[in-house]
Regions:
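Generic structural signal for well-ordered alpha-helical scaffold segments
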Residues: 1-4, 103, 107
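ATP-dependent NMP and nucleoside kinases share a basic, alpha-helical "lid"
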Residues: 1-64, 70
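Small-molecule kinase domains that catalyze NTP-dependent phosphoryl transfer to phosphate-bearing small molecules
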Residues: 45-101, 108
Length: 108
């Protein structure tokens, strides 16, 4: 909602969210459309194994051991986006290349 308010006032708002269900993503997309505000979905398609390797807090290990429940990708489902405007994969480039791709789609 904050991103929608910012975008409505002309600010490019970037929100990094875990949105595990298509229904939630569709709801946000529809809210933007209803407000006449552009919406760009970027799917950072990273395998769970890579996420685990990059996890500095050990949250994936805690989820796998059962100490954390409802953890997306481990013991709670994740519905991968099928209609994202941009899909980024770790194997396709580094963080700088991905940032450039995002900026290009936001500022055509």
């Amino acid at each position: 909602e904050v991103a929608l308010l910012l975008a409505d006032s002309g600010v490019v708002a970037i929100a990094s969210l875990i949105s595990p269900f298509k229904e939630g993503r569709d709801r946000i997309r529809a809210a933007h459309a209803a407000a006449g505000v552009p919406f760009v979905e970027v799917f950072v398609d990273t395998p769970v194994s890579v996420c685990e390797k990059r996890d500095p807090k050990g949250m994936y290990a805690l989820a796998r051991s059962g100490e954390i429940t409802g953890f997306t990708g481990v013991n709670s489902p994740y519905e991968a986006p099928t209609d994202a405007e941009l899909v980024l994969r770790p194997s396709d480039g580094d963080a700088v290349a991905h940032a450039i791709a995002i900026m290009e789609i936001l500022t055509p």
